[in-house]
Amino acid sequence: MAKTSVSTSKRTKSVAKSTSKITSKTTSKAAQKAATKMKALTKPAFQAAPVSVVADAADSGAPMLPITVSFKDIETARDAIRRYVYETPCAASERLSNMTGCKLSLKLENLQMTGSYKERGSLNKILRLTDKERKAGVIAASAGNHAQGVAYAAQRNGIKATIVMPETTPLAKVRGTQEFNAEVILHGSSYDDAFARAMELQHEHGYSFIHAFDDPLIIAGQGTVGLELLEQNPYLDAVIVPIGGGGLIAGIAIAMKEINPKIRIIGVEAEQVPSMKASVAAGKITEVERASTIADGIAVAKVGKHTFPIVQKYVDDIVTVNEEEIANAIMVLLEREKTLVEGSGAAGFAAVYNHKISGIDGKRVAVVVTGGNIDITILAKILERGLAKDGRLASLKIIVPDKPGSIAEIAAIVAKHRANVLNIAHDRVFTAASLRETEVEFLLETKGKHHVQEIVRDIAKHNFHVKLEKPA
């Protein structure tokens, strides 16, 4: 891998050459407009990005796997899938920009037909099948967005699709896959069990297996997101992409670095399953322990042999985000942007919102919102915990005399402060209160932490023992 400190003259020549390529190879007016704007990037005014952990690992002397995807492959993929996919907007957000300190845009792949970017790669793969392969049908193993992507792509092309999913898959995802006329087989308790069964069925019936990320055609299909980003905002300084197996970031990196070598491509992983970060640090594909995470769409224990060398060469840095940061990002996007995203879809914004990425203050940054297929029960928990941490949902445990009027007195205090009582619960047995007392729990909807403290102080002034429960 070439070091990141490439000379300005070499990079400007590369940009100029790439600009010429996209002008000659692409016919859309939007692409030609993007290429014209990109000529401004040939000015030798930028500084090379600092050497990242990715560059250090790639230069460690470990042998690199071959790169099996080209810019031309991504252009070809775009021509193939164009009529099947929605060119999602890259929406600038003044509100989020003010919150994060950068000029932030969201590439809303959650608006695709299946609710995620996955259909891009699946379509590109399925459209390349031979007549014999199409007749036999396709098979995939997935508990999430890949299942719906394959099912949708197969349905649009009149091909039978069989999807093997773990028995623990939420009913909503099973039904979502079945809506595209796929045959769903529930097998085992994990993805590994489902994958093994899918392999057995492939050999038995001659199906074509559609991998979730580790296939050159899948990578090229996902890379069409990068081409759209270049056309929609050719002056981007950085693009933030969630990483699972690496198919999306690999495709985006090839597409965008070909046209604009100075753009920063930053990957984001769940802290519980940092397989790409571990692999890059080791200089080879390294499997990590599979763990439960709210970002289940990027919980991949082992990255791909096709995706890894692309990330080694083109991705500038990889950061991680924890569960609380992801959950909070989901809530912020829903409340402030009216955008519903799943855990993996929120990972990129979580990294920006929590200032995990250096050097982007004041810069033009795009975050790829990869999907919006979140389980409703999980969303409800996220919202409730988020409201509790923000002080807008409060649980007060109060010891009161076990006599008529005690609860009414507390309720009057709460009403005076104009808080809303959501629930009241008694506990006369499992409490430290004396036999003449009882513990009452008030669940309140408030205006925030300061409002809660006012209520607590007022209750205490009336000689009640009150305790504010801390959120989990």
Q: What residue spans do the PLM features occupy?
A:
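PLP-dependent amino-acid enzyme catalytic core
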Residues: 3, 39, 43-472
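Polybasic, lysine-enriched low-complexity intrinsically disordered terminal tails
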Residues: 1-56
